[in-house]
Amino acid sequence: MSIALVTGADGFIGSRLVELLVKKGYKIKALSQYNSFNNWGWIEDIECKDKVEVLTGDIRDPHYCKFITKNVDIIFHLAALIAIPYSYVAPDSYVDTNIKGTLNICQAAKEQGNIRVIHTSTSEVYGTAQYTPIDEEHPMQPQSPYSATKIAADA
């Protein structure tokens, strides 16, 4: 059985991905950002949570990233700070999580033996559409600190 690590599993899309991967037969390590309430976000509501190993931690910690990537076959990296308005108030937090956190996951995957990483992005990297439908050739136009950090993480 393949083991998948899902970062950002506590978010809406991450929790839906966890459910899908469980149905497809994956053993899941689901990363939820640590909080003092021990709340797992959207993972709390999934029907298959008893089949999921929930880990609480922070992708900003490179040592923790090395720890959670041990014995993993694939990583689905969805973890990110996403609140656009707050990115103007605390842009360094977005740099630390969205850029450095992504780098930590990628470096840990490489050090563990080149684990495949599937990284998610956002339509925010394209800014205001110059044409529709937007495709991957559309120019990137960051319009917030959030979208700028997602563009950097995509690179």
Sequence positions of predicted segments:
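N-terminal Rossmann-like NAD(P)+-binding domain of SDR-like oxidoreductases, especially those catalyzing
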Residues: M1-A155
